[in-house]
């Protein structure tokens, strides 16, 4: 993943909406910066990192997202997780790279269930 593709999303503490951007840690909390001078404090427990992939609709796929994967009449639903020991994203129990993202659709995330 290129450095310019490293981005995060988290739930804005004030509005409850999800925002994307750069992650900033300050003494008074965690922030997402969307623009050079515009940042918002976020719920640190909801911070998710971008996988570098998009689904078939062009929606960015983040850690914690719930996706539906369809291939050859089979459908599988699962969440995207990070395994620090393998340094890889997982879909269910398998490496994410084994599943073409153009066969996936983001349907939500584990924090909104």
Positions of predicted regions on the chain:
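Secondary-structure transition motif
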Residues: 1-113
